[in-house]
Amino acid sequence: MLFDGISQLTDEQIKTAVLRWLDSSIAYGVSAVFDAGFPEHNGVNERIYACLQELDRQGKLPVYVDGCYVLTQPRKMKEALEGVKRFREKFNTEHMKGHTLKIFMDGTLKIETAAMVTPYVDTGLTGATAFDAEQVSEILKELNEAGLDLHVHTVGEAASRVVLDGVELARKELGDRFRVKVTCAHLWVQDDADLERFAKLGVIANFTPWWHSGNVGGNPIAYWPTFIGEKRAHSMFRCKTMWDSGALVTWSSDEVFYGDFKNWSPYLAMEIGMTRWINEKTRFEEASRTVAAFPPESERMNIEEMILGYTINGAKQLGVEAAKGSITPGKDADFLVFEKDLLTAEHEGFSYNKPSEVFFKGKTIN
């Protein structure tokens, strides 16, 4: 219901929104994205991708876009598998691709629909996953045969566990033939027992760093224990632990609206990923400021890790690391020029950074 209004958008409205997004992407120096789609609106997703593809054919798409087909219910598995195959065939221009199935495995923590291993403290409920491990395994085998990839919305600890279990089952059956790139996105809460399984199973861990201040203004340190207890509430967003375990960690914005695009900024995400705090020095809305750094401080990233997660690691997630993600002879010359050295810039206030020059395939586009 949240997105029902988008089905009424005209083609002109879609193009206007897409062009605004492109302007923002160019300004921030974003040159490659994964679009995670709207749930239950694959028709709208298809129209957006068609708009992007037409821009690409006209030479007006200076961003590489990897789209997806969205699956939310087991009864639509067959339809979705056919849909993602169709998207791959239909969207295959130089900068517009579509070779990924997106699954919404659970909901969100704020309304207690995120799937948990340990129950919520106020209700005693655990939420639920949309699929079980056996269904995930079957989907993976189909995707593997077709040469397609999987991206999964996983907020709660049980949601990512189901994906990990499904990958384990599929790998056990397929062995060295398994080649699906599997990404778990968001990862608000993780059970200790699953942290090292990402690296072991080759599952990509995608986080949304601008949430890592606690994703609620004021005092998230006191807010989240009322939902999931102090131990779990103070060990959320365990990206550094994942990184150190050897897992491939990538970053995202989870932007779903066309506001002022502030939370589309990778520099905002980098700041919060490094500080786990939104304060008066952060280029963000005052209502989102928090009282202190969100625990644990041990999960704060350094600038090198933030840059790698946005560049070569992101390219690996999309399967385009042979052409993108690093400045290497033979690769696309996608790079940015800054007035400041990002490696030595202050962490607090890092969100005010912006490139002075943006190059896409060797040409200045800003």
Task: Locate predicted features.
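Divalent metal-binding segments
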Residues: 1-85, 103, 108-159, 176, ...
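His/Asp/Glu-enriched, well-ordered alpha-helical/loop segment
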Residues: 5, 16, 141-150, 158-182, ...
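An acidic- and aromatic-residue-enriched active-site/binding cleft used to recognize and process polar
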Residues: 38, 68-72, 155-157, 187-189, ...
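Short glycine/threonine-rich loop-to-helix capping motif typified by GTGT followed
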Residues: 39-59, 191-197, 201, 263-266, ...
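Phosphate/diphosphate-binding loops
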Residues: 60-102, 179-192, 197-204, 217-250
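Non-cysteine beta-strand/loop elements that form the S-adenosyl-L-methionine
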Residues: 93-113, 202-213, 275
